């Protein structure tokens, strides 16, 4: 069965795993998912991830979630731009998440990046999700 929103599917898997206090969660692999996970890792929301190839030829990504003293680092994870309603923002209209305590992840012409990186590089794009 095909997934109409692969990023939304991955974020839901992470949200469900955090709710169940799991240490790891797996999701089908793609380049866009890996770029989003790169941003989450560099911003300190996950410990890391590994890509693995299975016998049937389908690659999977195993995400290692991060906890601080038993409390999940990810408190809120929401998808903004969806297949039915894409949300694009200019550099001037990139929203702050929780007064700067959280981040937004954008897909820009210069790659997938966090909101503060997009402001530094003066580039807008599709607002993928918000993390707090």
From Swiss-Prot:
The keyword Ribosomal protein applies. One of its GO terms (biological process) is translation. It holds the Pfam family Ribosomal_S8. Keywords: Ribonucleoprotein, Ribosomal protein, RNA-binding, rRNA-binding. PROSITE patterns: RIBOSOMAL_S8 (PS00053). The keyword DNA-binding does not apply. GO terms for molecular function: rRNA binding; structural constituent of ribosome. One of its GO terms (cellular component) is ribosome. It comes from the Bacteria. Disulfide bonds: none annotated. Part of the 30S ribosomal subunit. Contacts proteins S5 and S12. Belongs to the universal ribosomal protein uS8 family. One of the primary rRNA binding proteins, it binds directly to 16S rRNA central domain where it helps coordinate assembly of the platform of the 30S subunit. This is Small ribosomal subunit protein uS8. The lineage of its organism: Bacteria, Pseudomonadati, Pseudomonadota, Alphaproteobacteria, Hyphomicrobiales.
């Amino acid at each position: 069965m095909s997934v109409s929103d692969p990023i939304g599917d991955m974020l839901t898997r992470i949200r469900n795993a955090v709710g169940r206090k799991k240490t790891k969660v797996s999701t089908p692999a793609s380049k866009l998912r890996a770029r989003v996970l790169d941003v989450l890792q560099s911003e300190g929301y996950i410990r890391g991830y590994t890509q693995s190839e299975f016998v049937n030829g389908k690659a999977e990504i195993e995400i290692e979630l991060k906890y601080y003293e038993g409390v999940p680092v990810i408190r809120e994870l929401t998808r903004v731009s969806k297949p039915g309603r894409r949300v694009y923002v200019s550099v001037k209209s990139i929203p702050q998440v929780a007064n700067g305590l959280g981040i937004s992840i954008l897909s820009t012409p210069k790659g997938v990046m966090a909101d503060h990186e997009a402001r530094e590089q003066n580039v807008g794009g599709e607002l993928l999700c918000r993390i707090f």
